[in-house]
Amino acid sequence: MFKMIYNIARTELQMLFYSPVAWLILVVFGIQAGLIFAGKIEGLVVSQEMGYSVAGATFNIFANPWGAVFVNMQNYLYFYIPLLTMSLVSKELSSGSIRLLYSSPITNLQIIVGKFVSMMIYGLFMIGILLLITLCSWSVIKDFDWPMVFVGLLGLYLLICAYAAIGIFMSSLTSYQIVAAIGTFAVLMVLSMIGNWWQEYDFIRDVTYWLAMPGRSGKFIAGLICSEDLLYFILVVCLFLALTIIRLNAVRQKIRFVITLGRNVGVILLVCVLGFITSMPKMKVYYDATATKMNTLTPNSQEIVAKLDGGMTITTYINALDPGASWYAAFYFLKPDMERFEQYLRFKPDMKLKYVYYYDTCANPQLDRRFPDKNLREKMIEVCKMYGLDSNRFMGPEEIRKKIDLSGEGNTFVRQIVRDKLGYEFITICNVSRVNERFLPPSNGW
C-alpha cells in the first residue's frame, strides 16, 4: 500500500515539475516573500538609524500582525494553491485515464493519499523558500528566536496542507481544470473570511469562527502551539480527503446518491463532534515557543490564577447607549473579546464568560443632541439600526436593575467577576471606558 502511494506521489511530482506552473509559482512566491522581507528590514534599519529601539526584531519581521513576512504570506497562500491542485484529479476525469486507474489493483484511498503526499512535498519547497529568508535574518539579528520561527513555519505548512486537501476535493468534482481552480479559490476565500460572518447569532458564530483558517495559523505564527489548532488542521485535511474518496467511490462503484449523501453527512458530523471536543478549554494543551513567553501569563500572574480555586464567572455588561466602550464586546466582536481571556482560560479552564446586553441612562451628550425628543428605548432602537443589531436582545432598564445595579458605574461598560467558593463572593467591576478598575466588596466582606 505505502509503495503504491509513494509511486503515485512521485509520478504526480514529476508531472507537476514538468509544467512551468509549478516553477513559476515558486519563483513568484519567493519574490513576493523577499520583497516583504526587504521592506521589514528596511523599516528596522531606518528605526535604528533614527535612534529607536529595535527590540523583538524576530517578532517584528516574521510575526507582527502589521505586515510581517509570515502574516502576509499566510494571506496570499490561497492564490497559489488552486493553481497547483486544479489538475490533480480533474485531468484524470477529462482524459479518461481514471478508468485505467480503476482497472488496476489500486484503491481510491491510495490514489488520493498519493496525490496529497505530492502536494505535501511541494509545500516543503514553499516552506524552504521562507526558511532561506529566515537564515538571512539569523545572520543579522542578535538572539534570533528560532523556536518561534519554526512554529510559524509549521503553521504555514499546515495551512498549505489544508488548502491542498480542499483543492483535491474540488478537483474531483469536475473534469474542467479552470472550474476546479475557481471553485477552490472560492472555497478558500470563504474560509478566509467566514470568521467575520453572522457573528450576532450565538450558534452560527461558534461554527463560523471554528471554520476560519487564518486565525488558526496566526497563533502558530505568533509562536504558540495549541492542541485545538493543530488538531483542527488534521481534521480539515482528513475531512476533505474523506469526502474526495467518497466521491470517487460513488463514481467508480455507481453508488446511489442517497447512500453517498449519508456518508458525506456522517463524515462531516464526526469531524464536527471531534472539533467540538478539541475546542473545550479543559481539552486544550499549549506550548509557547517564544523566547520571552509572550503568549503566556507571567509567573506571578500564573501564581495568582492558581490561587483562584473554585468556579469563577466573568459577566460583561454592555450598555447600548454608552458612548465609550459600549461595543468593546458587541455581537460582532464577541469572539475576539473572548480571546482576550484565553491566557487565563489556559490556566483556569473552568472559568466561564457571560455577556449581558441592556440599555439604561448613560452620559451621552452626542446621542442626546441627535435625538433630543426620543426616550431611552427609542434611542436604543436608533443605535441598533446604525450598527445593524437586533434591538430585542437588549434588556430594558427595569429588567437589568433587577439583576444588578450599575448606576454606581454610570451604566457604562463593566465586567463583573464572581467567585463561588466557600460560600463567599468576590466581585470586581472594571470600567473600560474610563480606563480604571475598582473592587466592590461583597455583602459579607473580603
Model-identified regions with their sequence ranges:
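Aromatic- and glycine-rich beta-strand/loop motifs that create alpha-glucan
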Residues: 1-26
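Juxtamembrane extramembrane loops of integral membrane proteins
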Residues: 282-446
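Terminal transmembrane helical anchor/hairpin motif
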Residues: 40-63, 181-253
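Secretory targeting signals
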Residues: 35-38, 56-74, 113-175
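Hydrophobic alpha-helical transmembrane segments of multi-pass membrane transport/permease proteins
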Residues: 20-46, 72-81, 186-190, 271
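Long, hydrophobic alpha-helical segments
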Residues: 65-91
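Transmembrane helix boundary and interhelical loop/hinge segments in multi-pass membrane proteins
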Residues: 83-102, 116
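Internal/C-terminal transmembrane anchor helices
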Residues: 256-282
